[in-house]
Amino acid sequence: MDHLKMELRHWVLSEAKELTNLCNAVDRHYLSDRLPNPYTEKDAEEWLKMVSDNDTITGIYRAIVCDGKLIGSISVEKKDDDAEIGYMLHNDYSNKGIGTEAVKQICPIAFKVLSLEQITANVFQPNIASIRVLLKNGFKYKGTIPNAVIKDGNVYDLLIYVLTKETR
């Protein structure tokens, strides 16, 4: 991470404008279509309210901040005894070890607070950077769902990675 100081922190309801700017600045090529495009301030306000109401109940939701600036988002959302991790970073902060560090910090919190057995990551096949982040954090390749995702006219395999409570 060189000299950058990265931290995960709770979201603040007043950050709708910053969140809107972030969501409209990230590379969406490999992001889920759950994120509206374009992302509006109303979308941000609704999401921040959901996070405020549900943090530590249905998931762990954190802002990724670097040197005091909002640069990304990371969450682990519960689904029964499993949960799915998702993250995004502003393009200017990619390939600096920040994603790896954010995943490293959030997983122990999620296992403890949400009483999880495992955390799953679903990755579009060409997203090598995300695969590297997961492998560096102990996630193991579990399988492939062929032709599972259509995004911007492209068809991608969906790769599944898992981190269990025992193997972390």
What are these regions (language model features)?
Residues 31-37, 58-65:
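A short, aromatic/hydrophobic, helix- or strand-capping loop or linear motif
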Residues 1-29, 63-168:
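Acyl-donor (CoA/ACP) binding surface of acyl/acetyltransferases
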